[in-house]
From Swiss-Prot:
Annotated NCBIfam families: L31, PRK00528.1
Signal peptide: none
PROSITE patterns, per the entry: RIBOSOMAL_L31 (PS01143)
UniProt xrefs under Pfam families: Ribosomal_L31
Known role: Binds the 23S rRNA.
Biological processes per GO annotation: translation
Domain of life: Bacteria
MF (Gene Ontology): rRNA binding; structural constituent of ribosome
Organism: Caulobacter vibrioides (strain NA1000 / CB15N)
Subunit structure: Part of the 50S ribosomal subunit.
Family that this chain belongs to: Belongs to the bacterial ribosomal protein bL31 family. Type A subfamily.
Name of the protein in question: Large ribosomal subunit protein bL31
Keywords recorded for this protein, A-Z: Ribonucleoprotein, Ribosomal protein, RNA-binding, rRNA-binding
Manganese found in the keyword field: no
Native organism taxonomy: Bacteria, Pseudomonadati, Pseudomonadota, Alphaproteobacteria, Caulobacterales
């Protein structure tokens, strides 16, 4: 097995949207880093069965909707 080719695997803290947190091992950041989640299993519409709108991060959803507003997908 090759030596020194794998990323550092260390403990980080993951903070959920409700403020609760847990420790896990990851290659994210450095030892003791905090990963704050925007969406987690408790708030994601796919797992909660809700019809919540997608969060528009940086206008991406708005740009997509504007670009494809007239597209119906039907062949003429």
């Amino acid at each position: 097995m090759k030596q020194d080719i794998h990323p550092d695997y260390h403990f980080i803290t993951v903070t959920l949207t409700d403020g609760s947190s847990y420790k896990t091992r990851s290659t994210y950041g450095k030892e003791g880093a905090n990963l704050a989640l925007d969406i987690d299993p408790r708030t994601h519409p796919a797992w909660t069965g809700g019809n919540a709108q997608l969060m528009d991060r940086g206008g991406r959803v708005s740009r997509f909707n504007a670009k494809f507003a007239g597209f119906t997908g039907k062949k003429a």
